A protein has these predicted regions:
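Predominantly a Rossmann-like dinucleotide-binding segment in NAD(P)-dependent oxidoreductases
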Residues: 2-98
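Contiguous beta-strand/loop segments that form the cofactor/metal-binding neighborhood of enzyme cores
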Residues: 64-140
Length: 140
């Protein structure tokens, strides 16, 4: 569970049922550290080093932490994946291909009690103004 008091409160409210029937969930993690196209590529930009998931592998655990702790397992997943910068400096005076996903939006369905509820997960490395921004919205 994230240490942040707000995250713990959101978890407790959702778990207790006090917010009523849940109608929608949106959870995400955004940052903007990769907006600079002159930033050298690192291991997170190469499928050979981090797998094909890219932003999903890097940021997904933060977006999924509370929903999974609440037992909300995504089904019927529709993904929108984006590669913002297909090439970056390699840090050695050259350029290298970046073949991982920079941004990922997952639209899913979850089971909350007897109801199916839409859940959107957002993992973005390229989000202007974001500085390691984690959030969750549980609408009920």
């Amino acid at each position: 569970m994230p240490f942040f008091p707000g995250a713990q409160r959101a978890f407790e409210l959702a778990k207790s049922g006090s917010i009523g029937r849940i109608l929608e969930v949106v959870s995400g993690f955004h940052h903007s550290s990769d907006l600079d196209p002159t930033k050298a590529a690192n291991w997170k930009r190469l499928n050979s080093m981090c797998g094909e998931g890219g932003a999903l592998n890097d940021l997904g655990m933060h977006a999924c932490h509370i929903p999974l702790r609440l037992g909300w397992k995504p089904s019927r997943v529709f993904a929108q994946l984006q590669k913002g910068y297909p090439q970056r400096p390699d840090g050695k005076g050259g350029v290298t291909n970046c073949d991982t996903w920079d941004n990922a939006l997952l639209n899913t369905w979850i089971k909350v009690g007897e109801h199916e509820v839409p859940m959107r997960l957002e993992m973005k490395r390229l989000m202007p103004g974001a500085t390691n921004t984690w959030y969750i919205e549980i609408l009920g």
